[in-house]
Design a protein with these regions (language model features):
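Conserved beta-alpha-beta core of the PfkB/ribokinase-like small-molecule kinase fold
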Residues: 4-7, 20-95, 120-122
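Short internal alpha-helix immediately C-terminal to a glycine-rich phosphate-binding loop
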Residues: 7-13
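Structural alpha-helical scaffold elements that stabilize or flank donor/cofactor-binding regions
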Residues: 13-14, 60
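Structural motif
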Residues: 19-20, 112
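Conserved phosphate-binding/catalytic region of the ribokinase-like
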Residues: 55, 80-196
Length: 196
């Protein structure tokens, strides 16, 4: 049974106590839109992981502070393929596709867009500048199922406490690397103690 708007109406009075709200498209869209609106009205940052990918209204996009997508979701949202067949040959890896895809999404009203690039790292396109952070190298891939969730959890935790975007992205990448080196989905999510 899916959550309904009626079940989250209490948030209108509570949301100002939050540092950040994380949404994803597995939640019914009308619930996401209402929570995002509450957060926006109370100046609470909203992180959206728009998977599974659905059409997002312009109004909803303007409530989002950080939109985090992987290469496939970026392509679904923009039509721009971010090539990932370089196999550690950095001379063949070009950030332009990720930069353009993130700019297209920013043009729809989201101020900050992150595109996770798997073993290549992550880009972050903000109103001020473009960031790129390489992934942690030489990690044995055991199970990648929770890598995105690990990255998003670490990003959200650290963006509320650290001023340095570089440090936030490094910690999020490291957390995702710990996750892919461990079997299971929930079991692979590291604790904050393991990340330190």
């Amino acid at each position: 049974m899916a959550i309904t708007v009626d079940e989250i109406c209490y948030l209108e009075d509570e949301i100002e106590k939050y540092d950040l709200v994380v949404l994803q498209n597995a939640i019914p869209m009308e619930v996401n839109e209402e929570v995002a609106r509450y957060a926006y009205e109370h100046q609470v940052d909203v992180v959206l992981n728009p998977t599974p990918v659905k059409k997002l209204s312009k109004e909803f996009m303007q409530y989002i502070t950080y939109l985090i997508v992987n290469e496939q979701a970026a392509k679904s949202m923009t039509g721009i393929k971010i090539h990932s067949d370089w196999k550690r040959d950095w001379t063949r890896f070009n950030l332009d596709e990720a930069r353009v895809a993130s700019a297209v999404i920013r043009g729809r009203g989201v101020p900050t867009v992150l595109v996770t690039l798997g073993e290549k790292g992550v880009i972050m396109n903000t109103p001020e500048r473009f960031y790129y952070k390489k992934a942690v190298e030489d990690v044995e891939l055991v199970d990648p199922r929770a890598a995105g969730d690990a990255f998003i959890g670490a990003f959200c935790t650290r963006i509320c406490t650290d001023d340095s975007v570089g440090k936030v992205l490094s910690i999020a990448n490291y957390t995702a690397a710990l996750s892919i080196a461990t079997p299971g989905a929930i079991e692979s999510l590291p604790t904050s103690k393991q990340v330190r």
